[in-house]
Amino acid sequence: MSLSTKDIVDGFWRHRPEDGFPPAPVERLEEYDGAERLNLACTQTELPPHRQQKLVEAWCEALPGFTRLRFLWMSSRVSQALFEAACRVPRLEGLYVKWGAIDDLSPVARRLGLRFLHVGSAPRITSIECLSELRGLEVLELENLHRVADLSVIGRLSDLEGLALYGGEKRWQVPDLAPVSRLAALRYLFLVGLRPANRSLRPLYGLEHLRTLRLDPSWPQDEVLDLQVRCPELRIT
């Protein structure tokens, strides 16, 4: 699966339910039909606590046995145990985690075939160094990982074509965008709520294949204008 023109403009993980991306959410194991796509929402239910726990435990046990599953959305709160179970799905190519109580990303490193990854709000995470194992990653989206300051690992993901870094209302503070400068294959980049200390977009000057850049209004206008002059084919929104 290569990125489409629409992916490059609006992002790979954009919602397109008319195409079953994601499919309808599933709460109970018996609702899953063995398809290649699964939208799992097994937490934040109205079940009593003991039944809720049993439900999550059942999914944790079952997920590693789903040999046909290729794309998994986890659209309710994700525990560390549930995340680790998802990372054991053998043929997984795409994983979307909306948000959760995850404090360790390292289990994802065992999924060397992973190509598309979104990690939503997970404020306990302090390091993304484990992503260095995912050399085949094509799309990476990280959201509200405010305790992560070192983005250097991103520069080693040379196959990345799509990158999104979201900070939300609380700005995500990082030193600079230097790691992004090494992503020669990058085609879209979303930087919303991210605040490099030097406020510079210069690391993007050499990204010849970059076609879409999404920024929030807080970026210095002189930086944005200079980038547009140097990269006239770049669409900045």
Which residues does each predicted region cover?
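Concave beta-strand-loop units of leucine-rich repeat
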Residues: 2-237
